[in-house]
Design a protein with these regions (language model features):
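Glycine-rich phosphate-binding "P-loop"
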Residues: 60-61, 115-134
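Catalytic pocket-lining loop regions of alpha/beta-barrel enzymes
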Residues: 129-211
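An N-terminally biased module of ancient metal coordination in phosphate/nucleic-acid-related enzymes
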Residues: 1-74
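A cross-domain feature marking catalytic cores of carbohydrate-active enzymes
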Residues: 8-10, 57-59, 87-92, 114-117, ...
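Generic structural signal for well-ordered alpha-helices
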Residues: 39-44, 70-74, 97-102, 139-143, ...
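Short, electropositive alpha-helical surface patch
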Residues: 64-79, 165-178
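Acidic-and-aromatic substrate-binding clefts and catalytic sites of carbohydrate-active enzymes
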Residues: 33, 60-67, 90-97, 157-163, ...
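Structural preference for beta-strand elements that scaffold enzyme active sites
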Residues: 2-5, 52-55, 83-87, 110-114, ...
Length: 211
């Protein structure tokens, strides 16, 4: 069976700093990730599968020049054939972001943008965003630019934010949204899972959303 890996990461610690590797993480100890993971590693892990294409999701984040990562990933693709699509990073809380989006789009494999949305008030470990950005006017203005550049948006968020996300998604029906990591469920108790399931059902009402 032919497979497209729709969400993977590649990093080279000799090329970029990855500050998130040193931050407290909701999943606990991630020290085992502090090794390079390159295209050859991806292909080795998939050697028993018919992997025909892949989509790389940004993994530097929180940096001043995110286009550098896009340029690097495009060079990997040009040399090794993977990845085929790039979901890149831009800080959607910046007012002057359009020029950076244009720079990302100079690289032929650019397909979308991800800005981590996860936020829980007074819970810094579980908050990747500095505030609830889904209701922020600067964020909404930048999000609207995706239609102009024919880019998708990867949504990484908690179920408590699904209603905000749904309102945004419905306001821009021509922007495709990809819900990351099955909507990032955190707990296994039935009340939590029920809220998560019901939230996904709400998001599923929008035809411009995929999981």
């Amino acid at each position: 069976m032919k497979i497209i890996d729709a969400h993977h990461h590649t990093w080279d610690l000799s090329v970029f700093p990855y500050s998130w590797m040193n931050d407290p993480h909701p999943t606990g100890d991630i020290s085992h990730l502090k090794n390079n993971y390159l295209i050859d590693d991806l292909l080795e892990d998939a050697k028993n599968l018919e992997l025909i294409k892949s989509v790389h999701i940004q993994c530097r984040g929180g940096i001043n020049s995110p286009v550098e990562e896009t340029k690097w990933l495009q060079s990997l693709s040009d040399k090794q054939g993977f990845p085929h699509g790039l979901v890149v990073y831009s800080n959607f809380l910046r007012a002057d972001i359009e020029k950076e989006i244009e720079e990302h789009c100079q690289f032929k494999n650019t397909r979308g943008i991800r800005y981590l949305l996860n936020y829980i008030n007074n819970d810094p470990i579980n908050s990747f965003a500095p505030k609830e950005v889904l209701i922020n006017n600067t964020f909404k203005k930048n999000y609207s630019l995706l239609e102009k550049y024919n880019l998708s948006f990867d949504m990484h968020l908690w179920w408590t934010q699904y209603n905000y996300a749904f309102d945004l998604i419905k306001s821009y029906p021509n922007i495709l949204n990809i819900i990351n990591h099955a909507g990032t469920p955190q707990k296994r108790d039935e009340e939590y899972l029920s809220n998560w399931r019901n939230g996904l059902k709400t998001l599923a009402q929008a035809s411009n959303t995929v999981l």
